[in-house]
Amino acid sequence: MEILRIEPTPSPNTMKVVLSYTREDKLSNTYKKVEETQPRFINQLLSIDGITSIFHVMNFLAVDKAPKADWEVILPDIKAAFSDANKVLESVNEPQIDNHFGEIKAELLTFKGIPYQIKLTSADQELREQLPQTYVDHMTQAQTAHDNIVFMRKWLDLGNRYGNIQEVMDGVLEEVLTTYPESQLPVLVKHALEENHATNNYHFYRHVSLDEYHATDNWKTRLRMLNHFPKPTFEDIPLLDLALSDEKVPVRRQAIVLLGMIESKEILPYLYKGLRDKSPVVRRTAGDCISDLGYPEALPEMVLLLDDPQKIVRWRAAMFIFDEGNAEQLPALKAHINDNAFEVKLQIEMAISRIENGDEALGSVWKQMANRTI
């Protein structure tokens, strides 16, 4: 059994080790401590200083490390463990990229359009928080005797966030309470009881003018306007451009999200403003939007992000260059080859290799890892 390759994952504390051997039992196991009944190579890996657990399924391992441990120290020990156990030369080659490094997915559970729970999901952690009791009470008021609650409830995608998961939860909670103020709950209940919610597709959209937005002094009202904004058009750019200068990060972030929905190269200068925002959350969100659009014209701006102080932003830049870059970006990539964040350094190395070899970009599927049972 050899190591075929080592891949980064969305979690900075987890690496995927792809093996030449595929389990025939189609089972999965999580190992946290050395035990005699376990495979020898698993125990050897668990004996490595810094490794906290190993998830084994199909043909790969998900190896977790302690937050303060260093992958650059651990990975050679992992390779050596396989070499010692199998007496074969491992072939570690071309790690593959994943699109979601550092992301925390935010979702809102609703029933007939009434929110009552938030869920955050990262690569290796899930956090839930119920909204204040009044939201649950109003959700209950919207139920009828014939409602199938399990079928009719719906998770709304609130987009991706970045940072400490508890701090993200605090911020998302504030945004949700702003978007759905308590004063609006009776209206939502009335609508829920009057309308047919068999498909549960209700969402309140309202277009606002630049003058109306500009006249609003309360940032929470401005955020609520943007959160209820329909898909924008070119005519909405002045309003969204104004929102990019808002003092509140959630407002600026939502403006970037809306701008990214205008699928045109003409929107790039406004997304570039997001790349230069003082908040790393806004910068990363702008980088994500640019990556989704996939315009190579953005390469010069994304190259500048290789000097960003936040690794989640630098990683996005390296990822974009991996996908869209060419020989013109090689000098910049090589100048940053010694990035102090291992995950960023790995993406830069992969971008250099892809460009020099002319290979196509590859993605990774993490469904099994996301659904693993610890």
UniProtKB/Swiss-Prot annotation:
User: Which molecular function GO terms apply here?
Assistant: oxidoreductase activity
Name used for this protein in its record: Conserved virulence factor C
Disulfide bridge positions per record: none
* UniProt KW Protein biosynthesis keyword: no
Q: Extract the Gene3D superfamilies matched here.
A: Leucine-rich Repeat Variant, Scaffold protein Nfu/NifU, N-terminal domain
Q: Which UniProt keywords apply?
A: Virulence
Family note: Belongs to the CvfC family.
Function of this protein?
A: Required for hemolysin production.
User: Which organism was this protein described from?
Assistant: Staphylococcus aureus (strain USA300)
